[in-house]
Structures are given as structure tokens and as C-alpha cells.
């Protein structure tokens, strides 16, 4: 069973061409290497207010229709503040295979066609329907959209606390896992969106939970052969068959990790109809890179000594940075943040920097200047002073004044209590 797992397209008009280039790459790969299932783990759009009559919206529908001509597609709604329930509109997409879009936790089985007329088609069915009609699904999928406090309060009538919600999530996961146990030797895939404890957002920084977070232990209670998740833009294998696909494009300058999608393969023994008789616990997962533009983040502090090499000005430093970036990356962009003294910032020509960088081969460039008052530096002496009298003296020196001894004496008395 081959699954293409992707997420976090974040389609938006300002980055339309870059996003479409990378998502088209996924579809082109699928045409050459047809999967048995597409799993899209949320955040297809960057805003639920994206107009349907935009090139981004049209691209989303076209891409999903193309996928549906190759394999069934399972989608969960992602971050509510981003796309809300807008993916539900994709239920209208049509192809040779059916689509499943979920905004609530639910389980479905995919029953493929078995006769000559229906050989390329199948149907998503609830597990209750499958058991009632005695069907044998090709695989089972548990859809876990990003959990929201509003959902649990409205649906479960429990207190709006993270602890209570975590308990409710435990109940859902355990229940889903128990139901799947009744389908022996049927591959079980989880498609989810949200925050998993221990996930990394960069090489060194762990994600800190600020909303509802699920643990690996909770996910393992689902008894799944594969857990596909979205929300974190850094692709990663978390162990125990749990994966974040990451985003197919770089969302921000400074994202240095590779971008792409996963191709997972679940192995097992099947009958003449392709139904699984037994499942091999070994899972093979390949990360396939997309041609995402490299977005470098350069920070120059003109207020500090050693910002540039001796005899080198700011423009030469920027050129050297661009030369290094262009050696390793064919397609690249750069964000340059320059910190300068407020009285010297006027000497920095942003338009000229942008022109030079584009001439050096950048696809895009953004230059911003942080203006730093010199008084800010002088006031650091006040902050560094240990005692109240010392702070008064430092403040007076900054203003070119002197402090009367009587005031200093009162300061000593105040500090002494």
C-alpha cells in the first residue's frame, strides 16, 4: 500500500507561483509513481477568506481533481485560524476515485471496486456500514483534524481546560484504536493536524505547547500502522510510524531544512482482490524533496565593531553573502536586516541594495532597516550600574549633568531601607 503524504501548502496569492511549482511537483511525481492513497494533513490554504475566484483557489481544485484521477484522497481541516472549514468545499471535486474531507474526528474504510465496470473506483464507507454490509476494506483511515477547545466544549459539554480536553482526546484515540482492532490485518492510517509533543520546528528548538497538544503515547493508542500529521513545517520522522510531512515550500526566510513530502509503503500479503491477509510491521518511508526556493536570512549590525571585514563596506559584505548563497543554490532569495545608527540609516540605499542583489541572481529580495538611537547604547550604562546612586550618576553623565551629594545621600538611604 503506497501512500503519498503531504500537508501545509498554505496557498496564498503573494507566493502563488512558488507554492504551485512545488505542489505540481508532487502531482507530477504521483503520475510517474502512482500511489494507492493521497493523504493531505491540513492547512491547504493560508486563509479561510481566500476568494474562490483567485488563481490560488482554482489551483487547489485543479490539483485535487488531478490527484483523484490517480487515487483516493483523504483531507483533514487544519488550523482553524488559517483555513477554518474551507477545505469542505473540496468535497465537490471529482475524479476516478472518491474524496474524503473531515472537519471532525471520524473513521472510514476504503472499499475498492472489484468488478470490471468498477475496477478503477471505490467508496469511502463508515466502519459501521462496512461491518453491517460485510465488506472488506482495503485500508482504514482515522481522520483527526486539529482539535479545538470550541469543538470539545460544544460537542462534549466539558469544562474548557486543557486537562479535560486531553482526557477527551484520550477517549477518542482509545475508542478509535479499539474499533480498528476488530478489523484484523487491515492497514490502519491516521491523518491528523496539530501539535505533537516533542516535535521540532528547527534543528535545535522544540515546539512549546500553547494550544492542545497530543502525545506520542496517545497517538500509539490508535494502533495505527502509519500516522501522518501536518501543522509543523519541518518534515520529520518521530519514530513509531509517526511523521510530519512538513511544508512543500519554505514559508519564511531562514528555513534551511529540506522541503518535500513523504512516500510511505505498507507491506503485507494480499489476496487475489488486493485485500490484506497479513501486514508486515516494517514500514518504508522515503522523503522526496521539492524544488523549493532557498530563502536566506542575513542580519548585519552596523552599530557593532567587526560587522564587516577591514576596508569592506556594507554593500561588499552583502555581495559576499549573496555569492556564497548562490554557489549552493540555483534558485534563492534573501532577506537582509540591517541595524544602523539612527543618524546613519539615511546613508543606506535600500533600492540600490535590492537592485544589486537581484542582479546577482536572487529571485526575490527584502531589505529592512532597524534604526537604533545612540542614546539607547548610552542608557545601557544606567542599566548596568549596580546601586541606585551609581545609576543616578550614570544618568547624569549621559545628560551632561552632575548629581548633588545630598541627592546621592538620599539615594543611599532609600536603598538601605
Task: Write out the residue ranges for each language-model feature.
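Conserved catalytic scaffold of divalent metal-dependent phosphoesterases
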Residues: 88-212
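Divalent metal-coordination and catalytic microenvironments
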Residues: 8, 38, 43, 60-63, ...
Amino acid at each position: 500500500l503506497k501512500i503519498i503524504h503531504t500537508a501545509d501548502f498554505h496557498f496564498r496569492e503573494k507566493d502563488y507561483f512558488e507554492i504551485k511549482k512545488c505542489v505540481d511537483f508532487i502531482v507530477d511525481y504521483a503520475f510517474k509513481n502512482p500511489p494507492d492513497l493521497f493523504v493531505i494533513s491540513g492547512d491547504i490554504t493560508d486563509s479561510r477568506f481566500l476568494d474562490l475566484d483567485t488563481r490560488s483557489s482554482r489551483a487547489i481544485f485543479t490539483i485535487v481533481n488531478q490527484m483523484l484521477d490517480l487515487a483516493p484522497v483523504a483531507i483533514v481541516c487544519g488550523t482553524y485560524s488559517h483555513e477554518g472549514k474551507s477545505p469542505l468545499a473540496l468535497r465537490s471535486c471529482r475524479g476516478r476515485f472518491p474524496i474524503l474531507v473531515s472537519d471532525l474526528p471520524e473513521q472510514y474504510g476504503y472499499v475498492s471496486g472489484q468488478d470490471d465496470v468498477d475496477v478503477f473506483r471505490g467508496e469511502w464507507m463508515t466502519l459501521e456500514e462496512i461491518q453491517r454490509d460485510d465488506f472488506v476494506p482495503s485500508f482504514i483511515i482515522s481522520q483527526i483534524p486539529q482539535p479545538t477547545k470550541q469543538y470539545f466544549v460544544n460537542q462534549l459539554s466539558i469544562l474548557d481546560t486543557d486537562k479535560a480536553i486531553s482526557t477527551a482526546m484520550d477517549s477518542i484515540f482509545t475508542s478509535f484504536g479499539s474499533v480498528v482492532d476488530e478489523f484484523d490485518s487491515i492497514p490502519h492510517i491516521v491523518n491528523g493536524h496539530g501539535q505533537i509533543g516533542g516535535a521540532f520546528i528547527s534543528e535545535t528548538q522544540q515546539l512549546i505547547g500553547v494550544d492542545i497538544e497530543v502525545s506520542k503515547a496517545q497517538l500509539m493508542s490508535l494502533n495505527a500502522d502509519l500516522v501522518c500529521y501536518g501543522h509543523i513545517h519541518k518534515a520529520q520522522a518521530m519514530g513509531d510510524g509517526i511523521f510530519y510531512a512538513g511544508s512543500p515550500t519554505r514559508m519564511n526566510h531562514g528555513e534551511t531544512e529540506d522541503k518535500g513530502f513523504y512516500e510511505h509503503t505498507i507491506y503485507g500479503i494480499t489476496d487475489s482482490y488486493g485485500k490484506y491477509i497479513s501486514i508486515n510491521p516494517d514500514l518504508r518511508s522515503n522523503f522526496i524533496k521539492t524544488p523549493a526556493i532557498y530563502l536566506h536570512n542575513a542580519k548585519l549590525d552596523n552599530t557593532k565593531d567587526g560587522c564587516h571585514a577591514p576596508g569592506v563596506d556594507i554593500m561588499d559584505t552583502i555581495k559576499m553573502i549573496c555569492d556564497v548563497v548562490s554557489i549552493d543554490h540555483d534558485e534563492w532569495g534573501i532577506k537582509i536586516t540591517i541595524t544602523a545608527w539612527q543618524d546613519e540609516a539615511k546613508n543606506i540605499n535600500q533600492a540600490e541594495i535590492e537592485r544589486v542583489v537581484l542582479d546577482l541572481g536572487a529571485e526575490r529580495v527584502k531589505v529592512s532597516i532597524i534604526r537604533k538611537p545612540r542614546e539607547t547604547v548610552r542608557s545601557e550604562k544606567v542599566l548596568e550600574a549596580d546601586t541606585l546612586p551609581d545609576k543616578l550618576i550614570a544618568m547624569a553623565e549621559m545628560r551632561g549633568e552632575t548629581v548633588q551629594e545630598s541627592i546621592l545621600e538620599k539615594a543611599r538611604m532609600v536603598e538601605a531601607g
